[in-house]
Amino acid sequence: EIASCLVGSEMCIRDRSYCHAMGILITANHIEMVLVNLGDEIIKKDRIRLKFTAELSYCTEVAQKVKTFLEGELAKDTLLGIGVAIPGIIDQKERIVLKSHALGIENYSLRFLEQALEIPVYFENDANAAMLAEKKQKYPNAIYLSLNHTLGGAFCIDGKLFRGQNQKAGEFGHMILVPGGRKCYCGKSGCADAYCAASVLTQDNRQSLDAFMEKIESGDEKILQTWNEYLDHLAVLISNLRMAYDMDIILGGDVGGVLSDYMIPLGEKVMAYNGFEHDVSYLKNCSYTVSYTHLRAHETRGNLV
């Protein structure tokens, strides 16, 4: 298989549509999959409901979903590898998820999943994968805020992802934003995740983020109040991160993909907490809004080609 991949890599030099990479995002209740060629074109994408469990049967089921997803899409031996993104702290060398509150696992081996997929696999924390894809565009020094169902983060210094001493750098979602505040899924109270994750906007009515944003446009007063409170808390988090790191801040994830029309009111709120700067040009919209999982495939190309 490795030899076949090397042959494929030589073909990629001549034709970037020849070889492919796949990205998988694992969450508590779903897996998202995307297939791209080396020209960065999305060939196929899908989101499937699949509840995560720590049982070996889960790995087998993921492998079967991947096989079904890829059927009829590829010539033999043109898939260079798969990037798997996981909401948790990962020891890449040992192939272990050290801790994932979102999935409810600790010291979980990824080798069973790797064996089930039967192809080179690159594992990464979900926010780290997104940061790596963004910095390849134009942000060698930046923070990435992953505003998804849960809140994550990452940052690069001089083009290199900073992981920290214990692989925990960028866990902005579990910084205390409101002491004694709302209960976070991690067990603490007042975490930024409990105020700035996308789930804050969708949990009350079990609605989609798209439906929530449509209600903002229609002027729904209750929704507008929730949105303004959300932006207030996000502004505090942004201001704190700017003061601590003094670098660009990329707003990514599901909420980051819809914030472009609300950067002015968000910027005004941020400025109210920052007396050292006269603008918020350091706030950036994420480059990728079509498919969050696409970022994993994008990063996989760089690690396997």
Residue ranges and their predicted role:
Residues R14-I43, S146, F155-C156:
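Gly/Thr-rich phosphate-binding beta-strand-loop-beta motif of the actin/hexokinase/Hsp70
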Residues K45-R47, E55, R111, E118-K222:
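Glycine/GP-enriched mid-protein hinge/lid loop-to-helix segment characteristic of carbohydrate kinases
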Residues E1-G8, I13, H294, G302-V305:
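Single conserved hydrophobic/aromatic residue that forms the stacking wall/gate
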Residues I42, I96-V97, L161-F162:
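Hydrophobic "anchor" residues
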Residues I86, L147, A198, G253-D254:
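Short secondary-structure boundary segments
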Residues D46-N141, D261-Y273:
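Glycine-rich phosphate-binding loop and adjoining helix at the ATP-binding site
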Residues E55-L74, A192-Y195, T202-S260, L283-T289:
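Adenine-nucleotide phosphate-binding core of ATP-dependent small-molecule kinases
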Residues L266-H278, K284-R296, R301:
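Acidic/histidine-enriched, beta-strand-rich ligand/metal-binding domains
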